């Protein structure tokens, strides 16, 4: 009986619900072209390290799949401290993955997020500009354009911050905007309202 149930379950849910591998690799060449455009742009600006993100993820590891440095990642050895930090500032987390979903201009800058891939608009139109585009065939016959946008206000990988800012930054609470605002007010005005 168990064997019959396994066969029926696999036949009903296993085969029809699997994804075609082509859906994962059809845009690889477009990403390769745009990754090269990002590297060339970063090199021209003297930037050695930066991160990129995709507006809408296909997997939890798009950075690894499409070969770009990403905030979003899946790892079976994810740190609970990083998960807590991401959650407190409003980014999506689960017990073994972190995502850029929920990113704001401030968190994008803090994480050195310099480029964003999108088949439409960017997350922050007033803070970014179109760098390049590449086309590919989606689903075998639909022409799709992938854009890469450059954030104009990205911070470098390392930057100096007053030690009192870190000790006074209030990461408690459930509102990520209050927590982000706490960082800014603590860094700029020593915690006074601005």
Residue ranges and their predicted role:
Residues 28-32:
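A structure-centric feature marking long, well-folded core domains of fungal metabolic enzymes
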Residues 107, 112-194:
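Flexible, solvent-exposed extracytoplasmic
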Residues 33-43, 103, 135-138, 147:
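Intrinsically disordered, low-complexity boundary segments flanking structured domains
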Residues 2-25, 37-111, 155, 161-179:
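Extracytoplasmic/lumenal acceptor-recognition loop(s) of multi-pass membrane glycoenzymes
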């Amino acid at each position: 009986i168990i064997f019959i149930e396994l066969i029926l379950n696999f036949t009903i849910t296993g085969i029809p619900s699997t994804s075609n591998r082509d859906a994962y690799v059809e845009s690889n060449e477009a990403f390769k072209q745009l990754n090269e455009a990002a590297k060339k742009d970063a090199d021209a600006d003297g930037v050695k390290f930066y991160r990129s993100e995709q507006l809408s993820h296909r997997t939890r590891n798009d950075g690894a799949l499409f070969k770009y440095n990403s905030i979003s990642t899946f790892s079976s050895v994810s740190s609970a401290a990083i998960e807590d930090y991401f959650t407190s500032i409003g980014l999506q987390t689960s017990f073994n993955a972190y995502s850029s979903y929920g990113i704001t201009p401030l968190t994008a800058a803090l994480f050195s997020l310099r480029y964003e891939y999108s088949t439409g608009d960017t997350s922050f139109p007033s803070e970014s500009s179109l760098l390049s585009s590449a086309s590919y065939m989606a689903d075998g016959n639909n022409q799709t354009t992938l854009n890469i946008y450059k954030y104009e206000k990205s911070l470098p990988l390392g930057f100096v911050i007053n030690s009192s800012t870190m000790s006074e930054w209030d990461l408690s609470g459930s509102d990520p905007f209050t927590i982000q605002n706490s960082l800014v007010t603590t860094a700029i005005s020593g915690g006074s309202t601005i």
